[in-house]
Amino acid sequence: MAHSKQPSHFQSLMLLQWPLSYLAIFWILQPLFVYLLFTSLWPLPVLYFAWLFLDWKTPERGGRRSAWVRNWCVWTHIRDYFPITILKTKDLSPEHNYLMGVHPHGLLTFGAFCNFCTEATGFSKTFPGITPHLATLSWFFKIPFVREYLMAKGVCSVSQPAINYLLSHGTGNLVGIVVGGVGEALQSVPNTTTLILQKRKGFVRTALQHGAHLVPTFTFGETEVYDQVLFHKDSRMYKFQSCFRRIFGFYCCVFYGQSFCQGSTGLLPYSRPIVTVVGEPLPLPQIEKPSQEMVDKYHALYMDALHKLFDQHKTHYGCSETQKLFFL
């Protein structure tokens, strides 16, 4: 297991800001707007919801990113908590569009968030001319205020219309998809490198339809920042987790890390290095209706490229020479 340092209390508070900001939207801002409907300030929520109706399709039409939000100093403190870094192995030309596979999911995808949804690690300087979009569950964009906060950071919906729009309007767009999805969160255990990928081929088909280059990435350390309690598939808790996922779209995982006090257990992640290695892009032809054989061919090439990327860098970032990358 990787060594865990004790971050400063300030860094810990900055990290807590991330989930607490969403809780504040859910439990304070949204109820406040409902309350305002019954006061003399009722025009404010009415105007917002009218605008929300007119703006409903924006998450599927490129979103509305904010350079100001992406450059908030709070993200640099979250970066330094672990720390989080990004490693470029090849340049990405702004003359093409890219579909990037993000691996592994981990529990909270700290690496993908910090590297692609903020400028804390200098993405724009590392990949000039490339605009990153990290895709997430579509239903987040149906929640008032949450949708604006996500779009400001460059997050897009993982829906097919949203991805099609980004890959067909202009060049220099990079869409990141956490291919393993929420199911991979249950594989997020320290010292394991297991990805759900063998049957996940839709992203390859989409890349072929648009002639987008496939970019493999692997985030070392993503599964090391929390310990997770795993339940047997016949247990009631596992059945509850499966039911929870069917309703809400993600698993209710039981996990723990460290607290503000050194040596004690809490819900803060362990302060262990997270490094996202961005691999060499794999050029694809543009085929409007790719055959299954063509999809299988490029899916196999992608898995091979990802496997090589992992093997080339694993010993530099906490993995042993004998550690293998497994695909489910």
Swiss-Prot record:
The lineage of its organism: Eukaryota, Metazoa, Chordata, Craniata, Vertebrata. GO terms for biological process: arachidonate metabolic process; lipid metabolic process; wax biosynthetic process. One of its GO terms (molecular function) is long-chain-alcohol O-fatty-acyltransferase activity. It catalyses: a long chain fatty alcohol + a fatty acyl-CoA = a wax ester + CoA; 1,2-di-(9Z-octadecenoyl)-sn-glycerol + (9Z)-octadecenoyl-CoA = 1,2,3-tri-(9Z-octadecenoyl)-glycerol + CoA; hexadecan-1-ol + (9Z)-octadecenoyl-CoA = hexadecanyl (9Z)-octadecenoate + CoA; decan-1-ol + (9Z)-octadecenoyl-CoA = 1-O-decyl-(9Z)-octadecenoate + CoA. GO terms for cellular component: endoplasmic reticulum membrane. It comes from the Eukaryota. Predominantly expressed in skin, where it is limited to the sebaceous gland. Expressed in more mature, centrally located cells just before their rupture and sebum release. Also expressed in all tissues except spleen. Expressed at higher level in thymus, prostate and testis. Acyltransferase that catalyzes the formation of ester bonds between fatty alcohols and fatty acyl-CoAs to form wax monoesters. Shows a strong preference for decyl alcohol (C10), with less activity towards C16 and C18 alcohols. Shows a strong preference for saturated acyl-CoAs. This is Acyl-CoA wax alcohol acyltransferase 1. Its EC number is 2.3.1.75. It is found in: Endoplasmic reticulum membrane. The chain crosses the membrane at residues 12-32, 34-53. It is a multi-pass membrane protein. The keyword Coiled coil does not apply. InterPro entries: DAGAT.
